[in-house]
Curated annotation (Swiss-Prot):
Source organism of this protein record: Neisseria meningitidis serogroup C (strain 053442)
UniProt-recorded name of the protein: Recombination-associated protein RdgC
Signal peptide positions (record): none
Subcellular location: Cytoplasm, Nucleoid
InterPro entries listed in its UniProt record: RdgC (IPR007476)
Keywords: Cytoplasm, DNA recombination
The keyword Cytoplasm is assigned to this record: yes
Designated gene of the protein: rdgC
Amino acid sequence: MWFKQISFYPLNKEKLPEADALADKLAEAEFTHCQGLDWFSEGFTAPVSFSPELVFPADFTLRVALKKEEKVLPAGVIRDILEEKVAEIQNNEARNVGRKEKQELKEQITDDLLPRAFTRSSRTEAVFNTRHGYLLVNNAASAKAENILTKLREALGGLEASLPNTKQSPSSLMTGWLLQGHCEGGFELDSDCELKGTGDIVPVVKVSKQDLTADEVVQHVKNGKTVTQLGLVWREQIAFILTQDFTLKRIQYLDVLQEEAESNGDDAAGLAFASQILMAESVSIMLEELVSYLGGWQD
């Protein structure tokens, strides 16, 4: 239930969907399995295993999940069958098979195999935090995060969400913190970072499980490199990697949060309820602190 990586979008708090209205809209875009000649199918599915509902509400949070099912049809399989058919025509009819005919044969083979192809599925989850006005997506890859945002907009007929565009760039803030050897407020340096230089061949330095205040690490910044990823700990509650794109990776929720969730959840539903609230609230407060150190939002 705890997101291990996060992309987030600030929302218009005055135009957030209610749980029932959101569920009704998502029901119109519910997931169905791939049919016949479909290469893939995508739609909303139950975000928790113990309930068939498409929205899992917990106080001021709403959890949703987008499922995608794709047909797996290896190109090598199609190529082998095509070669067999071409050879058969050449042998039986004593003629060559042209490019256009090969393409037609390839399409026929694909259409024949698709209904019987194996499938693979993936899912992306998101939580609406209506108190703070954020959509938290359980994926740091921009394509995946943008996809569920697009699907939500389509289902709802619109959703006012924006990219997290701050006055100061995350890279600039991270570089400054590493250079000065400490962070501001409730943040502390952890033990991982990535730095990049400039030029035609961009030099990349990755530091793992080291003291980030050490001279050999700080020297990279003094030599002109900028920090693109930085390991941070927030108020002894969350450890994570902040990226230059303002996404969070390798998130670890430390014992204090885990124990609080467990103390408030007696069964699967109760634990999911408590975990969702604690995760959404703590992450959102942490993000707001980061935004303040980044100079606030761009107008």
